[in-house]
Regions:
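Helicase motor core with emphasis on the C-terminal RecA-like subdomain
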Residues: 2-11, 15-19, 23-45, 52-55, ...
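C-terminal accessory region of SF2 helicases/translocases
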Residues: 294-295, 299, 303-312, 318-627
């Protein structure tokens, strides 16, 4: 058998593995169920791709994101590794053809969304698939106590029952200890077998700034640290505004969010990857699956609601091992927003049922109907028609997803599809009477295999190049061919979609597991609380603090985060700093305390050290000293 290293060299042209990769691969090759926790950019996909290539058969990769699947398949095919993907952008005919190819062709990887596991078509082909490994990407999605629970992941357990002798490799970049255990349990590991790479990023400097004028600080950071940058914002509107403000400072910047067309997103992403654009200002729709090693700064203009998201997003900086910076900006309003989030993210059951009822009315779905159907969903029109708050609707939809009632895909991209629906004899006659449509028809027949048997994906831009016509002319002719009954034509679609997983129920009888719902809310409150502490009262090394959240107690002070640098400057150990800080907080009453009185209470501590801590707390706006010399806690 070819060694793992030789396989890596042959296809990836690397001479060595990254930390933990080889151990994980060997575990998989030994047939062991394995959980791998590797940081963003740590090479998770290599851990299942290498062993799958070394063994006979097909690796089944379960992944939640269509864009990631497409990227992985494209990258594998570029390496001459045959791979396929089945996702919601395919027609029934295309899914059937893909699964048939997986059975009869010499393919090594089949990427599948978890929703597809329970379809009759997949179940029909499953016994014929020679599966050598089940790889579960974004494995934290299986835990309802995690930050991104997706119910379809629970169906993977049924797959394990069907394939009891096939090992599973679960990979994730961020899972706290309780979620790690949940992954092991839900995926029915035969033995607990977990590989954890340290959550420490020794080249990444974390900093937090409480500041009123975020935009000025943002520009200051970009001017201070040259190179490629990502700026994360919470709202689509803000991404455009901030990109424009950055551009005014003669810094190349663009914006990116899920509301843009697929073509626009691809163009903006490529311009940033090629360094044509220096700064990309984006929502969290950006970044998944993008491997750009030379990002020097990741700046959060808004505070994320949990450490998992922050760690993943910040971790996109400095993948080349050189010094990089993760900067988080916040103000008093951000703190209030975070504190209010648990009640917003977990709406009252009455409100959830109201949104469900309104959704059924909007989509015109009668009681007892709808299971398995996909519906176009314009959320802006919906909230306007039913006078609902858009944040309530988004959060109610998330709850309905987690309860297994529906799925909401905001980033849907369905390519155009076409199929000839007349016989070849009639087609020949038609060509004679409609010569103006001949070029497009011949292009379809020559370019798209299977187009006479059923709907297949077509690419209108490709047709424009081959026929030397404009995109408008091609679309018009395709519509004309449909009107004349020659083809069935489904234009490209980027409208968000709702998929009902069950028949519509009367709203008053809609089942929501209240005990689990409350427990998920409590878990979320703990995540927000940890994030708030990171912002407002973290006096230990930030790298150490982040790592402790994920259960990694081995990390030492990084010496490069804002907290470490500040404590270095005041020549205090962490223990000394915390001791002085504690006395200060305990001494200051609600009415405040004169500075002289505070220094008396710090008797026995060197005055310069005491003042250094006071000055630090003042600069961090945790305390304030008024004109009378009275110290108060802010």
């Amino acid at each position: 058998m070819t060694s793992a290293l030789k396989t890596l060299q042959q296809y990836w042209h690397y001479n060595s593995f990254r930390p933990q990769q080889e151990e994980i691969i060997n575990s998989v090759l030994e047939g062991k169920d394995t959980l791998a926790l590797l940081p963003t950019g740590g090479g998770k996909s290599v851990c299942y791709q290498v062993p799958a290539l070394m063994n006979e058969g097909l690796c089944l990769v379960i992944s939640p994101l269509i864009a990631l699947m497409k990227d992985q398949v494209e990258n594998l095919n570029k390496k001459n590794i045959p791979a396929l993907a089945v996702h919601s952008g395919l027609t029934f005919y295309e899914v059937k053809k893909t699964l048939s190819n997986a059975v009869h062709g010499n393919f090594k990887f089949l990427y599948l969304s978890p929703e597809r596991l329970e379809t009759n078509l997949f179940k029909e082909y499953l016994p014929q698939l020679n599966i050598n490994l089940i790889a579960v990407d974004e494995a934290h999605c299986i835990s309802q106590w995690g930050y991104d629970f997706r119910p379809p992941y629970l169906r993977i357990a049924n797959l394990r029952d069907e394939l009891p002798n096939v090992p599973v490799l679960a990979v994730t970049a961020s899972a706290i200890p309780s979620v790690q255990q949940d992954i092991v349990d839900k995926l029915k590991f035969k033995n607990e077998n977990i590989f954890r790479q340290s959550f420490e990023r020794s080249n990444l400097s974390y900093s937090v700034f409480k500041i009123d004028s975020k935009i000025n600080k943002l520009i200051d950071v970009l001017n201070s640290v040259q190179g490629s940058s990502i700026v994360y914002c919470k709202s689509r509107r803000l991404t455009k505004q901030i990109a424009q403000l950055i551009s005014l400072q003669h810094i190349s910047a663009d914006f990116y969010h899920a509301g843009l067309s697929q073509e626009e997103r691809n163009k903006k992403q490529e311009a940033w990857i090629s360094n044509e654009t220096r700064v990309i200002v984006c929502t969290n729709a950006f970044g998944m699956g993008i491997d750009k090693p030379d990002v020097r700064t990741v700046i959060h203009y808004d505070a994320p609601d949990c450490m998992e998201y922050y760690y993943q997003e910040a971790g996109r900086a400095g993948r080349d091992g050189k010094r990089a910076y993760a900067v988080l900006l916040y103000n008093g309003e951000d703190v209030k927003t975070l504190e209010s989030l648990p009640d917003i993210r977990f709406p009252a059951l009455y409100d959830i049922k109201k949104v469900y009822q309104s959704l059924a009315d909007y989509l015109q779905i009668p009681v007892g109907i709808g299971e398995g159907n996909y519906y176009d969903f314009d959320i802006n029109e919906f909230v306007k028609n039913f006078e609902l708050d858009i944040h309530l609707v988004m959060n109610a939809l998330k709850v309905l997803e987690q309860e297994g009632h529906l799925t909401f895909n905001e980033n849907i991209f369905l390519p155009a599809h076409a199929s000839f629906i007349i016989t070849r004899e009639l087609l020949i006659d038609f060509e004679k009477t409609h010569p103006q449509l001949d070029d497009v028809m011949k292009c379809l027949l020559r370019t798209y295999e299977g187009i006479t048997d059923g709907l297949v994906s077509i690419h209108e831009k490709q047709i424009t190049k081959l026929t030397k016509q404009t995109i408008e002319e091609v679309k018009r002719q395709l519509q004309q061919l449909q009107t004349l009954g020659i083809i069935e034509y489904l234009p490209q679609k980027e409208t968000p979609q709702i998929n009902f997983l069950n028949n519509r129920a009367p709203a008053q009888f809609l089942y929501i597991d209240q005990k689990n719902y409350l427990h998920r809310k409590q878990q979320y409150e703990l995540r927000v609380e940890f994030m708030l502490k990171y912002l407002t009262s973290c006096n230990e090394c930030r790298s150490k603090y982040i790592s402790s959240y994920f259960g990694d107690a081995t990390v030492k002070d990084c010496d490069i985060c804002d907290v470490c640098l500040q404590q270095k400057n005041i020549s205090l150990t962490e223990k000394e700093f915390k001791a002085i800080e504690k006395i200060i907080y305990l001494s200051i009453t609600k009415e405040g305390l004169p500075v002289k009185e505070l220094l008396l209470r710090l008797n026995g501590i060197k005055k310069d050290k005491a003042w250094k801590v006071i000055e630090f707390l003042q600069s961090e706006k945790k305390i304030v000293i008024d004109e009378r010399g009275i110290i108060k806690i802010r």
